Amino acid sequence: MADPGGAKQGGDDKAYLWRLHRIFALYVVGVVAFLALMAWAEQRGLSRHWIGPIFLFLTVMVYAGIGVYGRTTDPEEYYVAGRRIPPIYNGMAAAADWMSAASFISLSGALYLQGFSGTPGQAGGLAYLLGWTGGFCLVALLIAPHLRAMGLYTVPDFFHVRFGGRWPRIIAALAAVLCSFTYVVAQIYGVGLIASRLTGVQFEIGIMLGLGGVLLCSFLGGMRAITWTQVAQYVVVLLAFLIPVSWLAYKQLGNPMAPLVYGAQLGKIADMEERLLDSPAEHQAVVAYLRRARDFEARLQDVEGALERERQKARERVRALRDQNADVGLIVSASRELVSLPRDAASARERWTREMRENYERARPLGGLPLHSQAFAGDPNGSPHERKEYELARRNFLALMFCPMVGTAGLPHLLTRYYTAPSVAAARTSVAWSLFFIALLYLSAPALAVLVKFEVMQNLVGSSFETLPNWLAQWARVEASLLSVEDVNGDGLVQFGEIRLGADLIMLATPELGGLPYVVSGLVAAGGLAAALSTADGLL
C-alpha cells in the first residue's frame, strides 16, 4: 500500500483517513481476488511449478512497487514518515515489523516440539508468546509515549538528549546496529529457504532475490515507504497464517474458529501419546537410536581409526556394487556416502559428537518430545527429584517469559516505529493496535501446533514408507535438517519417534501435511516471505 499522494493533512483529518481506508480496502480486495484466481487456475490445471514462482515474484514486485512509489527526499518523510501515520496503520506496520520469519515460520514449530511449557532441560512453549506480547504492554506504558513526546528521529537521539554527551549516543548506536545485524540474519535465512522451496532456485539465489526486494522497499523512501509496504505485507501474513489453521480446524472439528475449538484435540493427542508410550514398535525405534548413539560414542574413542574403517567399508561397498553390475542408482548412492564422510579427524569428531547427541536425544519416548499438554516437567506430588524438577521448570518458564518481555521493549526497529505517530496519544493507541494485530496471529499459533501434531499422529504415524507423500522428499532436499523420516526399526511402518520435523518446517508444510490445495502452500510461503521482508525492511 503506497502513501496516497503524500498530502499534508494531519493524521486525524477525515478526508485523509477516508482516502487511506479506501486504498487499503481496494488492496485487500485485490489480494483476495488474486487468491481466488490462483485457486481457479489450479483447478483448471495450472502446474504447481508455475504457482510457486507466481506467488514469489508477484508479491515481491508489489512490495517493490510500493517502495518505489513512496520514495522521498524530504528528511521528515524519510525518517519518520512525516509524523502523520494513523494509529491503526501504524499498529499494522508495527505488527508486520514484529512478525519476523522467526515468529511466522518457527513459533508454531516451537510449540509443536516443546509443548506448552518446554522440555525438562529447556523452558519454552507459551513462555515466548506471553513474553513477547507482554513486551508491547511495557512499550505502551513506559516507552512509546515518551519517545514520541521528544519529537526525535532515532533511538540514539533519545539517549543523547536523555543522558547527554557523546558516548551514550555512540553506545546506543552500536547496540542498535549489533541487534539489527543479528536479527536480520534470521530474516535473510527465511527468505532464502522460502524462495528456494517456491521456485526451486538455489538457496543463495533466493537470498539475493530477497535482498533486492528489501533494498527497493526501504532505501528509496525510508520510513514512509517502509510503513506502507509493511501494511501491505501484514495483510498477506495474516491471510497466510489464518487460512491454513482455519482450514485444518474445519477439516478436523467442523469449525474454522481454531483458537476456540482446538482444545478438543488436546485430549485426543494425550490418548495417542499414551498409546505411543506403550507401543512395542516405538520401543524398538528407541532401542535403534540408542544403538546408533553408542556406536558414535565408540567411534569417538578412536576417531582416526574409526574414520579409516568407515572409509574402507564405503570403498568396499562401492567396489562390490560395481563387481555385481548393480543398478547405477545404488552405485551413485554408495559413492555419495563415501564422498560425504568427514575429511579429517577434527571434522569427524565434530560431526560424530553432534550425531551422538542427536541420537541420544531421540532415544527417548516420543522421540524426545514432551507430553504436549503437560503444564511443567516433573511432578509436584512425586518423588523429591520430580518435585525439584517441577519447581525448576516453573522458575525457568517465568525467567524465559521475562527475558523476551524486556527484550521486545528494547528492540530498536520497533521503537522507531512510534516516532511516526501524529501525537503522544496516537503513539499509545498505535501500540494498542499493534498488540491487537499481533494477537490475531499469536492466539492461533498454539492451535496450529496442536492441529498439526494431531494430523501427524493420526495420518502419518503407522503409514507405510512405500506410500509416503512426495512433499516429504521435496522438503528434505531443500534442507536436510528440516525433515527426516527413517525406518530405524526396519518394520516398514512410520513410527512417531522416527519422524523429525524442524521447527521451521511446521508452518511451511502445514498445507501439504493437511492435504490442502497447493495454492494454500504458495500463500503460506508468500506469508513467510512477507514476514521476513517486513522485519528486514525495518532493521535495515
Mark where each language-model region is.
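Hydrophobic alpha-helical segments and their helix-loop junctions in multi-pass secondary transporters
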Residues: 38-40, 64-71, 180-188, 196, ...
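Membrane-interface helix-loop-helix modules in multi-pass membrane proteins
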Residues: 65-66, 77-152, 301-346, 361, ...
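Small-residue-rich segments of transmembrane alpha-helices in multi-pass membrane proteins
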Residues: 32, 87-94, 163-170, 233-247
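Hydrophobic, small-residue-rich membrane helices and short re-entrant helix-turn-helix hairpins
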Residues: 10-17, 151-163, 167, 222-234, ...
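Helix-loop-helix module between adjacent transmembrane segments
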Residues: 13-31, 95-96, 100, 122-221, ...
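Membrane-interfacial loop-to-helix junctions in multi-pass transporters
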Residues: 85-88, 162-170, 199-209, 393-394, ...
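Membrane-interface "cap" regions at the ends of multi-pass membrane proteins
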Residues: 2-104, 218-221, 332, 336-369, ...
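Interfacial loop-to-helix junctions that mark the boundaries of transmembrane helices
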Residues: 43-54, 115-130, 195-205, 386-401
